[in-house]
């Protein structure tokens, strides 16, 4: 996943430069990227025409001082390394080295993920720091988050798009297994990991992709293996709720996953058992919406919210957004409930702690009024977003944007398209195409990683 344009790292240094100068140059590049990232973050950019290159303002004394200090740190770091190597000492035990690495981590935390590949290719130290989970913990602590959109349009194959760098990312192919390939799969991005849940011949299985190692691994297990559940992540943690166990029983149980420790913890169960539900985090709480309950094929109209601090679930009646084209109000909800078995789980996403839902039948997007427990139309879906009863199209949040991943129906090929819009109070949604490429146009799974 550490990919970058080669021109960012192939710049020639003056012939008189020694290793110390290279260190200063490398640190200077990191600071330049860091400052450019901050300038881009502080600039109001809208629409596809806003992709610009901004130059760092060296007239700002505060930032210039930071560059000078960091260049001096880089010089000290190199001098420390040379003295350790010359004296035969243990480099790892040097307190100065550790201090300098912390300073470099702080600089790297402000750089864009799009630039990490270039930075990693400059030397082993930067490469090691970028593969260190501590860097991403530091970014979260500073409130620095960028998002990558992962999706699968071909079985066992994943690809990703980086909106900030406007580039497609290669993801290694998953290990081939016919049973897993044909099973229902759920996906979840949490921390620096992409989790894909499915079933092999004898048991459920979880495949984990790490952007730090660019590899897939398996072997991790929940306390209660399941499928067809609702899930959502918040930083380094995720919650899964409901679903079906290996015997097909619909579950009310829930678990919390910590990506930093790799541990699954059982949390209190929901009030109602449900499968094929959808989940989001909003206002720091976990919501589970809709789903099919025990003993029937009708969609549950209620939702539930889990308070992570109080560790309690609260039922929310009639929270399900309208899902049919058969009119409004309770009648539409009853029609939607009756046809639940053939429909995808509710298409919901949260942007700036506001909940949105996509109605594939009416091609509409609605916003949830938390105070009144009602849904109000705020716009339409992109024109070329198609689905089969909600299947094959992804509706997700990507930072401050809503994104729709999908493509028009086509015979013998097609393309995938990523549309995005920034929802704003009192205005209709204005969609724009972020990216498109030749691909299968049925989205099997999709997850947005923020790190």
UniProtKB/Swiss-Prot annotation:
GO terms for cellular component: nucleus. Kelch repeats lie at residues 137-188, 193-236, 237-284, 286-333, 349-395. Keywords: Kelch repeat, Repeat. InterPro entries: F-box-like_dom_sf (IPR036047), F-box/Kelch-repeat (IPR052439), F-box_dom (IPR001810), Kelch-typ_b-propeller (IPR015915), Kelch_1 (IPR006652). Residues 93-139 form the F-box domain. PANTHER family: F-BOX_KELCH-REPEAT PROTEIN, GALACTOSE OXIDASE/KELCH REPEAT PROTEIN-RELATED. This is F-box/kelch-repeat protein At1g74510. It comes from Arabidopsis thaliana (Mouse-ear cress). The lineage of its organism: Eukaryota, Viridiplantae, Streptophyta, Embryophyta, Tracheophyta.
């Amino acid at each position: 996943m550490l990919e970058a344009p080669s021109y960012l790292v192939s710049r020639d240094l003056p012939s008189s430069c020694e290793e110390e100068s290279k260190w200063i140059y490398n640190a200077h590049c990191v600071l330049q990227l860091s400052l450019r990232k901050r300038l881009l973050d502080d600039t109001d950019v809208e629409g596809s025409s806003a992709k610009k290159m901004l130059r760092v303002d060296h007239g700002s004394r505060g930032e210039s001082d930071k560059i000078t200090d960091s260049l001096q740190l880089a010089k000290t770091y190199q001098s420390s390394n040379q003295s350790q190597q010359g004296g035969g000492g243990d480099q790892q035990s040097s307190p100065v080295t550790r201090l300098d690495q912390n300073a470099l981590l702080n600089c790297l935390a402000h750089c864009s993920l799009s630039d990490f590949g270039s930075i990693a290719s400059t030397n082993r130290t930067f490469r090691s720091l970028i593969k260190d989970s501590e860097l991403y913990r530091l970014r979260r602590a500073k409130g620095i988050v960028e998002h990558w959109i992962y999706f699968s349009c071909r079985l066992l194959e994943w690809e990703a798009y980086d909106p900030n760098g406007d580039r497609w990312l290669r993801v290694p192919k998953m290990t081939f297994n016919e049973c897993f390939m044909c099973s229902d799969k759920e996906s979840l991005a949490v921390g620096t990991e992409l989790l894909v849940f499915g079933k092999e011949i004898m048991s459920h299985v979880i495949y984990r992709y790490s952007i730090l190692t660019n590899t897939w691994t398996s072997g991790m297990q929940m306390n209660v293996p399941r499928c067809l559940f609702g899930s959502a992540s918040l930083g380094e943690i995720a919650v899964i709720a409901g679903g079906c166990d290996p015997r097909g029983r619909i579950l009310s149980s829930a678990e919390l996953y910590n990506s930093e420790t790799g541990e699954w913890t059982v949390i209190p169960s929901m009030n109602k058992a449900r499968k094929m539900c959808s989940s989001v985090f909003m206002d720091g709480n976990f919501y589970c919406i809709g789903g099919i309950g025990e003993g029937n094929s009708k969609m549950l109209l209620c939702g539930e919210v889990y308070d992570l601090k109080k560790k309690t679930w609260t039922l929310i009646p009639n929270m399900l957004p309208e899902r049919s084209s058969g009119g409004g109000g309770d009648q539409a909800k009853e029609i939607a409930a009756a046809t639940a078995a053939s429909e995808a789980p509710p298409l919901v996403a949260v942007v700036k702690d506001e909940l949105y839902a996509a109605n594939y039948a009416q091609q509409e997007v609605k916003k949830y009024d938390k105070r009144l427990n009602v849904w109000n139309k705020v716009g339409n879906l992109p024109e070329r977003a198609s689905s089969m009863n909600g299947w094959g199209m992804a509706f997700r949040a990507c930072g401050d944007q809503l994104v729709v991943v999908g493509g028009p129906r086509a015979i013998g090929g097609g393309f995938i398209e990523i549309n995005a819009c920034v929802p704003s109070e009192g205005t209709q949604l204005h969609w724009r195409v972020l990216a498109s490429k030749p691909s299968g146009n049925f989205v099997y799974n999709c997850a947005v990683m923020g790190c």
